[in-house]
């Protein structure tokens, strides 16, 4: 990796955040697979550190949260003791928060879809906010105690609970059952009913699946190591927050949120390595 100049590194990183697999990047750039992977992991650590230090004291008003599924090494049904001994494998969930106004992603967390990860995620989110916010999640029960632990009573929280129809008997589906309706449920505080929504975070989930090859469903593209999975998300969200101009806002989410006063380039992200 030390032999790559900034332009070549930028080419590799651009491909990573625009939905290319590691092997396709090798074919396009001529950079070796090991070098691409090493750059990803090292840059991911630098991006994670930068966002952890700078995405604080945020003046968000409305925040939406959700979880997105992926797997590492193999799907959960194929996990064996031998595979577990070699490292993390099976289903993994990425918990994501988004500011509904600025589209900034203040934090994300990789773990299981369980109460422990939910609590850690909510405590991380609460620690980044400068004021009381309206929070909306789906109907996952893990959020109830997690939000209570992280925010106490200093939150306007509601759930948007989707109602699904039944699948025709004997029919298999790759997507969830058809959503036939939604129920808004106030949990704590005084959330504005007009803003009880998960539309932005669900659109963010699609952005992740389109932008990171390892999240693309029904393919053989998946993370082989948890370290690479975390690194790819860190690089992507650094790019999403600071480099990628949001079409509606016409600025980056970081600029809209007042975190940055300028438009970053991918070369600026690479500069974090130094």
How should each PLM-predicted stretch be described?
Residues 1-274:
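Residue-level recognition of single "structural anchor" positions
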């Amino acid at each position: 990796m030390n032999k790559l100049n900034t332009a070549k590194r930028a080419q590799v990183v651009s491909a990573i955040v625009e939905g290319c697999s590691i092997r396709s990047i090798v074919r396009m750039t001529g950079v070796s697979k090991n070098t691409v992977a090493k750059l990803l992991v090292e840059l991911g650590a630098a991006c994670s550190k930068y966002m952890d230090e700078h995405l604080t004291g945020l003046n968000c008003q409305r925040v939406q949260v959700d979880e997105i599924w992926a797997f590492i090494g193999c799907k959960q049904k194929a996990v064996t003791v031998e595979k577990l001994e070699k490292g993390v494998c099976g289903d993994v969930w990425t918990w994501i928060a988004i500011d509904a106004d600025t589209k900034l992603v203040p934090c994300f967390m990789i773990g299981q879809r369980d109460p422990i990860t939910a609590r850690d995620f909510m405590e991380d989110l609460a620690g980044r906010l400068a004021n009381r916010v309206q929070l909306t999640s789906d109907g996952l029960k893990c959020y109830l105690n997690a939000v209570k632990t992280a925010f106490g009573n200093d939150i306007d929280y509601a759930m948007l609970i989707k109602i699904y129809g039944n699948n025709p008997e004997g029919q298999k589906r790759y997507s969830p059952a058809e959503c036939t309706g939604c129920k808004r449920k106030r949990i704590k505080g005084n959330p504005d009913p007009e803003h009880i929504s998960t539309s932005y975070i669900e659109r963010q989930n699609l952005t992740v699946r389109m932008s990171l090859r390892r999240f693309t469903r029904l393919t053989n593209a998946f993370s082989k190591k948890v370290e690479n999975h975390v690194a790819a998300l860190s690089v992507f969200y650094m790019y999403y927050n600071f480099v990628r101009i949001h079409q509606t806002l016409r600025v980056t989410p970081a600029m809209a949120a007042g975190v940055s006063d300028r438009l970053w380039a991918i070369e600026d992200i690479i500069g974090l390595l130094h």
